[in-house]
């Protein structure tokens, strides 16, 4: 499962809309949508925001993003 797929599931389980998540994380809705579609990589700012909102540690988000990047290189 790619990071974007996981993020979409977490958002669904949270009961929030993508727009609500973007607003609470102080990121644009298009940027969040690009993350979900795996068109944008995660960064520390996003990972910290997701930790604060969802309780999933920053390192998990960053490691998952790194795994996605490594898989692209293969």
Residue ranges and their predicted role:
Residues 26-42, 64:
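Recognition helix of helix-turn-helix/homeodomain-like DNA-binding domains
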Residues 39-52:
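Short, basic-rich loop-to-helix N-cap that marks the start of a DNA-contacting helix
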Residues 20, 31, 60:
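Residues in the helix-turn-helix
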Residues 1-16, 63:
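A short, Lys/Arg-rich alpha-helix, primarily the initiator
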Residues 52, 59-74:
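Short, charged recognition helix plus adjacent turn
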